[in-house]
Amino acid sequence: MKKLVLIGLAFLITTSLSILYGQKTVVRYAPDDDGTVYTSVEAALKAGKAVYRLKLAKLANRDSLPEELFQLTELRELTVKGCRLCRLNQNIGKLTKLQYLNLDHNKLLRLPESIGRLSDLRTLVISRNILEELPESIGSLRQLATIDAWGNPLYVLPHSIGELRKTLRVLDLRQIPLTKWEYEAMEQLLPETDILFTDICECENRRDHD
């Protein structure tokens, strides 16, 4: 298995991850897809046609997604970044055509089990939240190729993640306080996955003194 030990190589990390899921190439999902990225739920609902991309930069006076969003069942890409989101609605499971879900830089404490219904999901970005664990249902995401989870206080990963061994190509666990033993366990579960991690002994020492 290929494994990257990344300590302070910010330029290398930025380059590799931008290739993986920061690319500018626009994927056309249907003949009527003109590449439009909507930036508010209100505008998307007024579009009068299928909406494939929604990118939210703020949620006014909210800590969860508006229920109206889940009417957009044709969504393929959903980005909710830096919105101070504290809770992800169970109704996220209704967006079954999602291929890309970016929840970077929020305040999520957990992900709902219903996320396992996103059977077409390819990329899951959950970096820079407050997640301590991932739901067992993540093992149901059999199309998932990339999980970006860096910067979370994850103390445990579900054993079901091993169900992704045939599709998962990148698992970003940088700045996560897992022990060396736990990383080795991930290698056994996901032998074909590139696991990105920070080889910093303080992470293990912190666990030993808890």
Feature names for model-found ranges:
Residues 1-27:
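Bacterial Sec-dependent N-terminal signal peptides
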Residues 31-34, 42-90, 95-100:
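LRR N-terminal entry segment and analogous cap-like coil->beta motifs
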Residues 48, 70-74, 93-97, 116-121, ...:
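Leucine-rich repeat
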Residues 52-57, 78-80, 99-103, 121-126, ...:
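Conserved hydrophobic beta-strand positions in leucine-rich repeat
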Residues 155-210:
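Leucine-rich solenoid repeat scaffolds
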